[in-house]
Amino acid sequence: MTALPPGQAPPAAPMAGVTTGMGWRRHRRAGAQNVPVTTAPIATAQTRTVRSERPIDLAATVSPLRRGLGDPCHRETPDGAHWHASRMPTGPVTYRLRQLDRCGVDAQAWGPGSAEFLERLPHMLCLDEDLTDFSPEHPKVAEAHRRNPGLRMLRTGLVFEAVVPAVLEQKVHTRTAHAAWRKLVWRYGTAAPGPAPDGLRVMPDAETWRHIPSWVYHRANVEPQRSKTIVLAARIAPKLEEAAALSPADAEKRLRTVPGIGVWTAAEIAQRAFGDPDALSVGDFHLAATVGWTLLGRPIDDDAMIEYLEPLRPHRYRAVRLLGLAGFAHKPKFGPRTPYTDHSRI
């Protein structure tokens, strides 16, 4: 494996959950060598280029970061760049990722957390993942894997950042969760550092989430059960962050010590924070039926899905993502949609 020398980059261009856990959306556009990161004042971008012997499909890999088209923390610009604002342990960061070529990604970062983010970038993009034990036998899964060799899991290592939107997405329509996320981040988040696209925000820190008044959650259409779960998680955020260094089983146990975080929510968090390729969103409103229709031609329930996907362990979530990216995932529509509930009017 090789790495490009770092340097100054050009200026940036001006029910459990409903659908988010499945990864059905279609996105189109081995380890990485430890490349030194350039250091510079906060106002100047720090840069890094990472490469891998295997392809890297940047768009597909980072797509789980985005919580809807209007996500205040994420932006995709016409030049193909992916902008995101996060809160690293060392401080806020704005980063811009761009597909360099089939096996390379360019990164720019601004803010106090820049150096830490760039140091962790290969880890985030799972450039160290080993797929030697992933040999799917089902022809659709095998074909989906062949078509999408660049899909990586996502491993941000930022647990609380994944907790809040996952809790907001519990047992509601996706549009309801995304609207609540936008309202709360716009109100309590902070401006992203550096030359970020207009409106890019850093999500509030745990202490801020902990002290958001209940009536504000209510006006954002978040009922007491979900808001209480967020507050409880915020109180032990440092302990939750430690889960990133635990085994998948122990990490799930740590997450589920929070009342209101169950198997579905823990999986949604693991898919983004831990890069867990086996984090199946059991309990998702659509997932089991979609897996059944896609692979068996008939609907199945959660228990049958778990049994059927067992041979794919520890890559069950990877298989689900691949089916979505390849356009194979489908489920016939029967009957009316689940009714929309506006809790803010109750």
Question: Which sequence ranges carry the predicted segments?
Answer:
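Residue-level detector of intrinsically disordered terminal segments
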Residues: P14-G21, P36-T38
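HhH-family (HhH-GPD) DNA N-glycosylase catalytic core used in base-excision repair
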Residues: T2-A3, W24-I346
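Residue-identity detector for glycine
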Residues: G7, G17, G21-G23, G31
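Extreme N-terminal basic, low-complexity initiation segments
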Residues: M1-A16
